[in-house]
Every structure is written in C-alpha cells, then in structure tokens.
Amino acid sequence: MLKFGTLGNDMLTIIKRLEDMTGVKANMISFDDEKVLSLFSEITALEIKAEELNGCDIGLIGLPMFNSDVDVKIFRETKPKSFSDIVRVLGLCHGTGIWEGNIQELIKNNECVLKTAICTRDDILFYLTEKGINLKIAFEITESIRKGKGVTLEWENEMKKHNIPEWYINSCKKIIYLFPKAHEVSLATVMFRLGYYKLYYPHEYYTAYFSIRKNEFDYKELECGKEELLDIIKGIEKIPKNDRSEKDAEMLRNAYVVLEMYLRGLECITTVSD
C-alpha cells in the first residue's frame, strides 16, 4: 500500500528537519515508548478509527518500509510489542520464502512464536551455536539457508543430533533469502523515530513529510475534503495493482497520509523550503 523503498537520504533529511522543528533529537527517543510501539499493531494512539481511514487499522501510514498489503497483514497478525519484535517482523516482511507457507503457518499451529521464529539470518547462526553446533558448521549452514540453497543431509543429521526440532529444519528448507539483522535494526530505528514524531508532533511531522515530497504531491487534487479523499483512494484501489501507474501509486500513498492528517484535526499543509 505504502512504500518508500530503502533507507535513503529522504528519511535522513526528514528526521533532521523534525529535529530542527521540534527541538527533540532523534537519538534521545526511547525505544520503549508504549504509545509509539502501539502504532505497529493498532491505530488507537492516533485517536482515529480504522473505518475512517478506509479500514487501515495500523498507525504506520507514511513510514518507510510499510509498503504492501502483505506487510500490513504481517504486522497485523504478529502484533509486535517491543522494538526487538519490530526488528523481527521486518525480517519476515523483507525475506523471501519466510512468511507465507512458512512462519505464518508455524505460528498459527502454535509450533513457534515470534520470538522463536526464524526472521533474520542471525537468528539461525545464534540458535545453532546455542544448541551446541560448531561455529564454523553453523555459519556454513546459515550461509546456505539465507541464500536459498537449503540444508544438506549431513547438516540435517547434525541439526537433529543437537535436538533441533523438525519444524525448525523444515522452516530452513523453505527459505529463499534472508536479510541480516543489522539491516532490519536500521530500518526499525528510523520507523520508530518517525513514529514518535508522528504521534507527538503531528503538525511538524506532516509538514516535513510533504516538504520532502513536494515534487510528487498534487496539492490541487489532494487538498480536498475527507469524502473526496476516500473516493480517490477507493478509485485507485479498484485498479488492479499491475495496471496502476507510478502516478497512481504516488497519489494513493499521499491520499492516505492527507486523509490521516485531516482525521487528526490538521487542515493545512505547510511546506519547508530546501
């Protein structure tokens, strides 16, 4: 639904502008703020209702790496409660062959929980060594799994010898690609800090957001009422995803953010010049 790609200059620029506008340094933001954490599983802290926001019930609109319906579903199903949970969920969002038909089913069947699931390549290495597997062998197994090359029979026997459960071994075999934990930590850090500003400094947040995207933002079309914005959103979402243009994607992304802004009681957008 909403995507900004990778962690880049835009995200760093917006954080710098928010620091300047609010006087709050990003590195002073605590990662255990419960209200900010709640944005990753619900929308209550923003004091708006999901039905007003076209059914979006998570407070992550406008944050980087919160991109597709799949990501929304993963956050909704896992309901992260801590910063470390957010890191793990991002690993599930970005990896290939890790969520659908794999960890999602294991969690549903109570074979594992978020904290014990494979989410990043680091999880495999640490778990194998904790179970007593030689570090060199554990690293070789991890490298093979994270590249989607699976587990050899010799490695599988080694894992069973160290009491690695069957569900874990089968999960490893389904993985096509895994990201490193450090990658997800950096993204989670940016998401959390932006979530803090979004929650506690809404005017400054939306000002910074749209000043960064002024070249892609159609003020004339989007500075309208809530009902008109909903019509725009629903109209674009009726178009099959593969048939949507880049302009459609930008319009949809920005329409959601403007609608959310209006629902939070802000009626105008102030841009910041470069």
Regions found by a protein language model. Name each.
Residues M1-D274:
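Noncatalytic, beta-rich nucleic-acid-contacting surfaces in large DNA/RNA-processing enzymes
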